[in-house]
Amino acid sequence: MTIRKVLNKYWGWTFLIVPLILQVVFFYFPMFQGAFYSFTNWTGLTYNFDFVGINNYKILMTDGKFMKAIGFTLVLTLALIVGEIVLGIIIARALNAKIKGKTFFRAWFFFPAVLSGLTVSLIFKQVFNYGLPAVGSALGIKFLETSMLGTANGAVIASIFVLLWQGVAMPIILFLSGLQSIPSEIVEAAAIDGADSKQTFWSVELPYLLPSISMVFIMALKAGLTAFDQIFALTGGGPNNSTTSLGLLVYNYAFKSNQYGYANAIALILFIIIGIVSVLQIKLSKKFEV
């Protein structure tokens, strides 16, 4: 076989070499390196460390901060999944109706998606700390006179609200696209058969929205389990670690306490959780595809 024939046969593979090298160097190598360090007491400050086996994982089981972070992360993730799906469908159905100015409203609801999560959190931090208390004082509304971020329950609610306010923008577009993909003949046939809005949704619209729901589920799951920058800017994990997510906990142990080995153990647990849930969700979603 001549050189020209070899090049012609394998030329396409040469375009994959650079991406594969980059993926190995910047994804797979750090991933396996992090998994290795999770079995050490590495501080990140020197090259000296001791192999401690599964000791870091044993400590996790009795770490109050870790358990608290697990609880908040699960609450946040569940709220985002339910909120983005339910609100996304409701708003998408409203925007799909024949209303005046729907182009404006579609752009309005999508606007939060183009903003930086950090910027949104910093803006809402000022609103919760100064804006709402000022309004509460002016109107004599007692529960608004103090910052929501000053109490554990208030900070949790504020965190969910901010992430949901920005996170629901993309699901609205996805659900709107799904609704517009429904053949008009099917909708008209349902109307002729006497189906009301509720019956049309459950029997006609929902089956076409299932692929979008599956995608939104994964997006919300990832956003909840990996939440970091918004929480970091909005509450910093406080008060009293009530809004510390797993991502923020990894950051605190790694960069504030210099416990890189322990932080990698938490990160690996988070990676495994996301992987398992994602695989199960993808398999289940295939059973409901139209």
Swiss-Prot record:
The chain crosses the membrane at residues 12-32, 72-92, 104-124, 156-176, 201-221, 231-253, 260-280. Residues 70-281 form the ABC transmembrane type-1 domain. One of its GO terms (biological process) is transmembrane transport. Pfam families: BPD_transp_1. GO terms for cellular component: plasma membrane. It is a multi-pass membrane protein. The keyword Metal-binding does not apply. It is found in: Cell membrane. Gene3D superfamilies: MetI-like (1.10.3720.10). InterPro entries: ABC_transporter_permease, MetI-like, MetI-like_sf. Involved in a binding protein-dependent transport system responsible for the uptake of melibiose, raffinose and isomaltotriose. Belongs to the binding-protein-dependent transport system permease family. MalFG subfamily. This is Multiple sugar-binding transport system permease protein MsmF. The gene is msmF.
